[in-house]
Amino acid sequence: MSQFFDKSEVRRIALSGEPVPFCGLYFYPITVEHYGIFLACESALTVRLSMLPAVYAVQNYAQALFSMQIDAMMQNGEAGQLGYWSRMMQLLVLSLKINPETASQCIKMIVDKDNPKTLKALVITQTTSENGESFARITPQQIGQIRELIALMNGRELPDEADNVELIQAEQDVQELNRAFELDVNMEDLKASIAANQHIRMKELDQWTILEFDLIKNAIDRDKHFMVYGIGEASGMVKFKNGNPVPSPFFNKKKENV
């Protein structure tokens, strides 16, 4: 459940491709054109603070990611720049429609003069054809809220920090052990599959929002599973204790029934 936003309203706006105003800025849904970058950076949204080293886990989201990356850069040089903080900044650039080439001029990091590892604020200048120039000073606490907004606009859910960390790790270990093979996951094949199903050219997908793309992809997947399970059960080749595991081609099961 969203802590700061009306989830259904944010999703409605995101599906329309329109921006959501927040903190004096305009946040846009990320499009399929940038899906590869989004997938490479989404771990910055879904990271569990409770699974970070204790020194970072006790900090707020923005400060934890920022100080963690500063420490990594001090230890590993340029290699340390590829952390959660950099990924979050890339997602911010995409969401604000800032030109990556001018991002360093449009997003300024303000740190404590006595402790450069302490983030004080982001000073952001955003210019769009629709809304002109916007200026905002964003606090670390607001960055945590922006994290939630970007996740909602692009169909992602934030982790529940109250979940049992040891149980989560155990489940991840089991999934790793049970992985029989690795798929060659790539955007070209995924886009080709969706385009073929929708009878459109692949390049037309680039302007879709990620949220719409994923909803269509999941609908295709649900429909195929509904048919395969239904045919299998009708033929007598397989019998499901509680009926078709995917009982509808149009709707998902309620979560408590999954």
Can you describe what each PLM-predicted range is?
Residues 77, 127, 205, 242-243:
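Alpha-helical protein-protein interaction elements
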